[in-house]
Amino acid sequence: LYAMSPMAARYSAGAPWLYLLADMPRDSQRLVDPADLHEGRARPKRKMPSLSINNPMEVLRQRLILEVARKQMREANQRQAVANRLFLQNVGKRGFWANSAPTRYDN
């Protein structure tokens, strides 16, 4: 069932798991072909978690876009309010026509 390992002579035959574990190479001892790294086949795992700024930058970008849109809407609303105020000041006023046309007709 077990193949004979080079370290089998050091351990008794009653404990085969010892030499099987001892014969397994560690990750740092394995040879990695540089061509494999470029093709993505044998990529070593990272020991620390990776940090990415893509998500926080996207959140900030969206908030900036929303803030710019809100500012433009506020300015447009203010311009419309001024235009409405001017319109309402002139509605129903007869003073504007008083200087240009006579108020009485002489027949």
Curated annotation (Swiss-Prot):
UniProt xrefs under Pfam families: CRF
Top-level taxon: Eukaryota
GO biological-process terms attached to the record: neuropeptide signaling pathway
Localization terms from the record: Secreted
Tissue-by-tissue expression: Expressed in corpora cardiaca (CC), corpora allata (CA), antennal lobe (AL) and gnathal ganglion (GNG) (at protein level). Expression in AL and GNG detected in some animals, in CC and CA in few animals (at protein level).
Keywords for the protein's UniProt record, in alphabetical order: Amidation, Cleavage on pair of basic residues, Hormone, Neuropeptide, Secreted
Recorded GO CC terms: extracellular region
Molecular-function annotations in GO: hormone activity
Modified sites of kind Valine amide: 91
Name under which the protein is recorded: Diuretic hormone 45
Protein species of origin: Agrotis ipsilon
Taxonomic lineage of the native organism: Eukaryota, Metazoa, Ecdysozoa, Arthropoda, Hexapoda
